[in-house]
Amino acid sequence: MLYRDEAIVLRTHKLGEADRIVTLLTRQRGRVRAVAKGVRRTTSRFGSRLEPFTHVDLQLAEGRNLDTITQAETLTPFSKGLGLDYDRYTAGTVMLETADRLVAEEREPSVQQFLLLVGGLRAMVAGEHAPGQVLDSYLLRSLAVAGYAPSFEHCARCGTLSAEGAHRWFNPSMGGMLCSTCRVPGSASPAPETVALLGALLAGDWAVVDPAAARNLKEASTLVAAYLAWHLERGLKSMAYVER
């Protein structure tokens, strides 16, 4: 059966002498793996349309294990904009790997994750905000869509609001900020400004994020990375290339 969908190319790997298996995050069918036949030949009709970061409109033939790409048209070549800036490119690779890991089930619709990734890549290319903060905002929101929303205002354990404006303790395994009563050993103690920044990153409140102090941005990035690693159960390979 043939079907059409739009997708972001997450990654590819070689298959045989001329083909590739392409991992896609599609709008309607979630994560899909498909064969692109002959794509590695110089005469391939696909050209560079099936490279990572490309937003494409596809026609595919459904298969038992792997679908087959029969047509591909580029909608947005995000790689062109990202390739001009190392920091934006490496941050973008983290976004792709995160989407690949958080949308674990194949062919399970995940429209919100797809739209979030497209929006995140578009923001990364636009360059209106620092790449590190675009990445952190994407990571928090992607985790929230996947069901791992962190709690920054209420205690993640008992649900109380802080009388002082922000709880003091942060623990990834507990789901975010903790009050003094619920604090567990090994919890971090971020600055109140950092806690407010984390909430703004989750909400996409750039009026708060953009003017934030460097020390708070760095502390927030460290906590976001720790929260992501906890819920993915292991770190991302691409994160090693991002300056945090």
Curated annotation (Swiss-Prot):
* Keyword DNA repair part of the UniProt annotation: yes
Stored Gene3D superfamilies: Nucleic acid-binding proteins, Recombination protein O, C-terminal domain
Indicate yes or no for the key word Cell membrane: no
Q: What is the top-level taxon of the source organism?
A: Bacteria
For the biological process aspect of GO, one term held by this record is: double-strand break repair
Q: Which GO terms describe its cellular component?
A: bacterial nucleoid
Record's keyword terms, sorted = DNA damage, DNA recombination, DNA repair
Which family does the UniProt entry place this protein in?
Belongs to the RecO family.
Q: What does this protein do?
A: Involved in DNA repair and RecF pathway recombination.
Q: What is the name of this protein?
A: DNA repair protein RecO
Provide the species name: Nocardioides sp. (strain ATCC BAA-499 / JS614)
Q: Which gene encodes it?
A: recO
